[in-house]
Amino acid sequence: MERAITPEKRDDDLQFDATLRPRTLQDYIGQEKIRENLKLFIDAAKGRSEALDHVLLYGPPGLGKTTLANIIACEMGVNIKSTSGPVIERPGDLAAILTNLEPHDVLFIDEIHRLSHVVEEILYPAMEDFQLDIIIGQGPSARSIKLDLPRFTLVGATTRAGLLSSPLRDRFGVISRLEFYTHDELAFIVTRSARILGMAIDREGALELARRSRGTPRIANRLLRRVRDYAQVRADGAITLSVVQETLRLLEIDEMGFDQMDRMILLTIIDKFGGGPVGLDTIGAAIGEESDTIEDVYEPFLIQNGFLNRTPRGRVATPAAYQHFGRLTPERPQGSLF
């Protein structure tokens, strides 16, 4: 069964997200500094009748990068073309997209860190000079021609900004990191989503759902769907604190927003490896999960909330992790082997 609290996109999220997605910066909740800056830059670009500078959005999955890309296009009054790094396999794929853009259009590339180097090299002159270099012919007779492109805005999104090459990163005029959301912000998002779906939810229920959503709107909205199911079948249709608590108990999501996999990671470090330090590959082998998945999907929330430390020697469970599971914190310094 798929995790209810994975921040990664799932197929069943697509239609639901489209229904709930805000269309304007005014409707967008959270990320105050990013919203303020984007409004300034968009207003300035529209005032000059120019395309917005290229924008790079990075941060953990599920925080609203795709939503912001769509809002940018909406606020600019232009079309958006969406694709992703893995889909653009050849330079010709990118060339076909670029040549079909209209002036000031937004090109959104999700997982932009997964573009191949060959495709990236096509993107450099397109971003900087709005030109496309095309090679005609082969061998000594090959020649390069330049095609002019309309001035467009590239919005790139990534969960791993460190994997972007410097030449690509340096071509973005606006670079913004999305942060995890506060409980109050998520409660507002849940309340707004419930209203759009025609559901009644009280303040306590919204806050409880927010507290268990790992600071991530995508998770909050997904859990809201499950709570809605419970309220419809086993309650009177209204979402209250007790309805939220009982739904999440059935889903095995505890008061910190941990599910079985989170608990497995922390308990593996505590019980099998003495609290750490232990390498990521070793943890992955012990629980049967890819180390990249642990690093990208599970770790950010555990580290952000003080349950896991990342050290040069490996991962270490913190005293908060021991307390959460009712374990005594070791008196010896973490990581001492002898």
From Swiss-Prot:
Taxonomy of the source species: Bacteria, Pseudomonadati, Thermodesulfobacteriota, Desulfuromonadia, Geobacterales
Enzyme category, top tier: hydrolase
A Pfam family recorded for this sequence: RuvB_C
Residues binding DNA: R310, R315
GO biological process: DNA recombination; DNA repair
Region of interest: Small ATPAse domain (RuvB-S): 182-252
UniProt binding sites for Mg(2+): T66
Regions annotated as coiled coil: none
Organism: Trichlorobacter lovleyi (strain ATCC BAA-1151 / DSM 17278 / SZ)
MF annotations from Gene Ontology: ATP binding; ATP hydrolysis activity; four-way junction DNA binding; four-way junction helicase activity
Chemical reaction(s) catalysed: ATP + H2O = ADP + phosphate + H(+)
UniProt name for this protein: Holliday junction branch migration complex subunit RuvB
NCBIfam families (UniProt xref): PRK00080.1 (NF000868), ruvB (TIGR00635)
Gene for this chain: ruvB
Keyword Cytoplasm among UniProt keywords: yes
